[in-house]
Amino acid sequence: YGKELNVQETTVYKPEYSWNYEVGSHLSLFNGKLKTDLAAFYMDTHDQQIAKFVNSGLGRMMVNAGSSESYGVEASFLASINKNLNMNVSYGYTHSTFKKYDGGTTSSEEQIDYSGNYVPFVPRHTMNAGANYSFFFDKSNWMQSLTLGMSYTGAGKIYWTEKNNVSQSFYGTLNGRISLQTKALQIDVWGRNLTNKDYTTFYFETMHRGFEQKSRPLQLGVDIRYHF
């Protein structure tokens, strides 16, 4: 016979409270050709709610993790080089750790303390960089415009558990798009994860086993839109 399940302990948890502080600015420079957004933030969270793997290994439950703090910066830049070329870059840094987290005891009655560990599912770095170049044609031409676009998106490091024993290191994906615009038709040919990068998008544990949800491989597609 297994240990009797305490339903109240697994279904009842306290509300989460947080104090959030943020300063930032939005700038438009060089007659609007360069736009920037800058921000810095700090979050002080108490009774933080997280999804925790249960000791039996059969699923997860919501628990209060004590307190945590998060701080970081975000920056984005959008530049219109000329009427044909646009470029954008964005970056974010987040440092999110538990200030206090009593994880209970192990089967051998050893105390579990996750204080100082990183909060799971929070990427430390996020970034995006992209560029679009457009060719514009005479309005009498059947082709109105042709746009070539490329972008690179990255994230990591990401911890998947409060133990910080499973993680995904920093990864990036390359994406591209070609858009053809006519008076009534728009055709987009696109590719995602062009380098076929392999990474983990989610992790969970059940029956004392860990399972990873893997990334989607290289994808190619075509979108067609008709304007009435």
Where are these regions (language model features)?
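Residue-level signal for pocket-adjacent positions within structured domains
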Residues: 8, 40, 58-63, 113-114, ...
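Membrane-embedded beta-barrel scaffold of Gram-negative outer-membrane proteins
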Residues: 12-71, 92, 96-102
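Short strand-coil-strand connectors
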Residues: 30-32, 82, 181-183
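Outer-membrane beta-barrel translocator domains and adjoining extracellular loop/strand segments
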Residues: 1-8, 48-56, 94, 99-107, ...
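Gram-negative outer-membrane beta-barrel transporters
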Residues: 42-44, 63-161, 225-227
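Hydrophobic packing within well-folded, soluble alpha/beta domains
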Residues: 38, 75-77, 89, 178, ...
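Conserved C-terminal beta-signal and adjacent last beta-strands/turns
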Residues: 21-22, 115-228
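Exposed loop/turn and edge beta-strand positions of beta-sandwich/beta-sheet ligand-binding modules
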Residues: 7, 17-19, 32, 59, ...
